[in-house]
């Protein structure tokens, strides 16, 4: 009987020792997936969503992002997914409100001659506006990037109180 108790205690000890080690191995084999893969930053940026696309953080004082030429109520956030013309990048946007406001401190990096007007949707190149393609956009929380049709790369990021702009110009063009 004594041998039987010893054997059972030994087996129970082995099981208790092996189980936590085995589960640790399983935890290490699980691939970590970023929660950002579940975020679609374009949600609400078309139709009547009025959501801006750009860089911001929760409860941040700045919402830096692109501005399209305003063609009506659907553009009140400054950006509409259906558009292909950007007129600049501003520090503040209202998102999802249904009322146009903010769009403060508009900055537009561009190449070529100095232009002081926005241009039009039909002829954006008559002013400082530029064409762009969504394939050239990178959008994620707190980061926005775009390569405009004049090959100027715009990168925007935001913290709680500060927006940071980085512009990279092609070396073969006047900027």
Predicted regions and their residues:
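Accessory carbohydrate-recognition regions in carbohydrate-active enzymes
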Residues: 26-175
